[in-house]
């Protein structure tokens, strides 16, 4: 069940509970892709253009562009043009702190599950 304070705030903004859940699906669905996670982590180190991302991650141009567009639409990354290049950078206001929280949670819980699975204990 969704937090009533969050729901109250969303209703004030004109969102329904269903819209909020659909927005959650879009947000978390963006994080399901391993390629998008790799792009996010690469951009946490600094801005990059498509060619730099392709080279660093070994992903083809079409996939990089498609994933960057999804990340941009969902507010995970921002783009800026410098000369003839478009550079992408992480959304420092929201995504950087969120990734730090996620990593803290993963190091406390998920890594242990992953290691147990690899050892055949899970």
What are these regions (language model features)?
Residues 2-23, 95-122:
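Amphipathic alpha-helical dimerization/coiled-coil segments
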Residues 19-63, 82-94:
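N-terminal helix-turn-helix DNA-binding core of bacterial DNA-binding proteins
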Residues 55, 72-73:
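Alpha-helical residues within the helix-turn-helix
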Residues 67:
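Residues within the DNA-recognition helix of helix-turn-helix
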